[in-house]
From Swiss-Prot:
Lineage: Bacteria, Bacillati, Bacillota, Bacilli, Lactobacillales
Family annotation (InterPro entries): UPF0346, YozE_SAM-like, YozE_SAM-like_sf
Listed name of the protein: UPF0346 protein EF_1680
Coiled-coil portions: none
Family in the record: Belongs to the UPF0346 family.
Provenance organism: Enterococcus faecalis (strain ATCC 700802 / V583)
Length: 72
């Protein structure tokens, strides 16, 4: 069974101060984050419209690629 992007993202939470960890920490606080989806477009649209904590969509794109590689 494939895990959702959110589940993958939660593995990156922690005290480190880098863009990926910051994204994971902030997404964990976002009660409306689409937690069950594996759909790039649904996540991308949500983040563009609702996630003021994500300063750059390139961060999401890079993590999406890592998610796909780790979720085969």
């Amino acid at each position: 069974m494939r895990r959702s992007f959110y589940h993958y993202l939660m593995t990156l939470k922690g005290p480190a101060k880098d863009s990926e960890t910051d994204f994971a920490n902030e997404a964990a606080k976002d009660i409306q984050f689409p937690k069950q989806t594996e759909d790039y477009h649904e996540l991308s649209s949500y983040l563009e419209m609702n996630a003021d904590y994500l300063s750059n969509m390139d961060i999401f794109d890079e993590l999406w690629e890592k998610y796909l590689e780790n979720n085969k």
